[in-house]
From Swiss-Prot:
InterPro entries: Fum_hydII, Fumarase/histidase_N, Fumarase_C_C, Fumarate_lyase_CS, Fumarate_lyase_fam, Fumarate_lyase_N, L-Aspartase-like. GO terms for molecular function: fumarate hydratase activity. GO terms for biological process: fumarate metabolic process; malate metabolic process; tricarboxylic acid cycle. Its EC number is 4.2.1.2. It comes from Staphylococcus aureus (strain Mu50 / ATCC 700699). The record marks E329 as: Important for catalytic activity. It catalyses: (S)-malate = fumarate + H2O. Involved in the TCA cycle. Catalyzes the stereospecific interconversion of fumarate to L-malate. GO terms for cellular component: cytoplasm. It is found in: Cytoplasm. Pfam families: FumaraseC_C, Lyase_1. This is Fumarate hydratase class II. Pathway: Carbohydrate metabolism; tricarboxylic acid cycle; (S)-malate from fumarate: step 1/1. Substrate binds at residues 97-99, 127-130, 137-139, 185, 317, 322-324.
Length: 461
């Protein structure tokens, strides 16, 4: 392998000649051969947005020449294009401030920027610390990149998937509005409900999650940049944080602002905890929806079988013809993983000792993973399951007509105790509810027909 020699304050080190990173990245690769979890590329893109904006701000404030500013902006745009992904090899498991990833970006930006200067025959050079990292610390850059990445992924990936599934459920809700089925509470028969009403509960869960997500993501717009090492802003111009936030907003289209309290921004990540709490709430709702779907689709002959779902693949390696609710199982596993991630994020956020929380990479890793899993899970569940949900009306009608809980409609006419006697007699003697009611003498056939109307029970008002 061809190598070149790079150096840092620890001395010289060999770096692969075809890679754009420098000495500190190479040391990190050697010092932290831990796990397979690469630092998400979205974090790198968040850093690129930050370094780009910092170059513009530093130029405005007289800290960088125009040539250096242009070169850094060019390098950051190259990163954002996805052309340089291979030059960011570091794993999540590194220093808790994310210093190695900050330097990885600084080194790649300076390498590409110096090529830009050389190509344009400009007699200047760019240093990863003195120029790319001008007015910054890893302590304020990593949480800034983290917030930029999280906000963008919620906007561009999670929310569209949430809307997609929500809209499908709304279509099913409207389509099945006239189908009356038996309701169930405590896994026991209850009073009737429309299939459309049941699905409306699922849909409204996603409506509420969309609102909660919109509220919680607002706090992610606060950026730590400008706080530098401990929140005081040492070595940074007083206007630097606001200018960087302005330029990030200009390039992304999102209204980022510089946090009004940088001491908080460096040592606490409660804003991410709140965001992930919403992700956990969404995971809980998806768990409930997926469980309901697979129970209602259970069968085909010895289960509830009130709905059918698409048959996507063989379900068993030993039982021929068996088809399983695989999409529901996938979504419930996603939900469990997100709930586990929430525990990690909450505990890690609590570990801000004095002026700095040093669990930033694991907070970022788990939150991004939750966003990806939920987004991919909802889209896949929607496309391969939810869109194909159909009622099995013969079974729905059979359960409805057999249900003893229709007796609830008699309460206002004969009282709770007599209605309970009718239901118990029917269950014990294997009678229909109508037969039991007439045999007790509490109601006539005409009264039963007038009072027991499922269509009235689902819309009592």
């Amino acid at each position: 392998m061809s190598v070149r020699i790079e150096h840092d304050t620890f001395g010289e080190i060999e770096v692969p000649a075809d890679k754009y990173w420098g000495a500190q990245t190479e040391r990190s690769k050697r010092n932290f051969p831990v796990g397979k979890e690469r630092m998400p590329i979205e974090v790198v893109y968040g850093f690129a947005q930050l370094k780009r904006a910092a170059a513009l701000a530093n130029f405005d404030l007289g800290k960088l020449s125009e040539a250096k500013k242009d070169a850094i902006v060019y390098a950051c745009d190259q990163i954002l294009s996805g052309e340089l992904d291979e030059h960011f090899p570091l794993v999540v498991w590194q220093t808790g401030s994310g210093t190695q990833s900050n330097m990885n970006v600084n080194e790649v930006v300076s390498y590409v920027a110096n090529m830009y200067l050389k190509d344009h025959q400009i007699d200047e050079s760019i240093h990863p610390n003195d120029d790319v990292n001008e007015s910054q610390s890893s302590n304020d850059t990593f949480p800034t990149a983290m917030h930029v990445a999280l906000y963008q992924e919620v906007e561009t990936k999670l929310e569209p998937a949430l809307k997609l599934l929500r809209n499908t459920l709304k279509e099913k809700e409207d389509k099945f509005e006239s189908i009356i089925k038996i309701g169930r509470t405590h896994l026991q028969d209850a009073t009737p409900i429309k299939l459309g009403q049941e699905i409306s509960g699922w849909r409204y869960m996603l409506d509420r999650c969309e609102i909660m997500l919109s509220e919680s993501k607002k706090h992610i717009l606060n950026l730590a940049i400008g706080g530098t090492a401990v929140g005081t802003g040492i070595n940074a111009h007083p206007e630097f944080g606001d200018k960087v936030a302005h330029y990030i907003s200009e390039n992304t289209g999102y209204p980022f602002v510089s946090s009004e309290n940088k001491f908080h921004a460096l040592t606490a990540h409660d804003e991410v905890v709140q965001l992930h709490g919403t992700l956990k709430a969404l995971a809980g709702d998806l768990m409930k929806i997926a469980n309901d779907v697979r129970w209602l689709a259970s069968g085909p002959r010895a289960g509830l079988a009130e709905i059918s779902i698409p048959e996507n693949e063989p379900g068993s390696s030993i039982m021929p013809g068996k088809v399983n609710p695989t999409q529901c199982e996938m979504l419930t596993m996603v939900a469990v993983q997100v709930m586990g991630n929430d525990t990690v994020v909450g505990f890690a956020s609590s570990q801000g000792n004095f002026e700095l929380n040093v669990y930033k990479p694991v907070i970022m890793h788990n939150t991004l993973q939750s966003i990806y899993l939920l987004a991919d899970g909802m889209e896949t569940f929607n496309n391969n399951c939810a869109v194909g949900i159909e009622p099995i009306e013969e079974n729905i009608d059979n359960y409805l007509n057999q249900s003893l809980m229709l007796v609830t409609a008699l309460n206002p006419h004969i009282g709770y105790e007599k209605a309970a006697q009718i239901a118990k007699k029917a269950h014990k003697e294997g009678l229909t509810l109508k037969e039991s009611a007439i045999q007790t003498g509490y109601v006539t056939e005409e009264q039963f027909e007038a009072w027991i109307k499922p269509e009235d029970m689902v819309d009592p008002h």
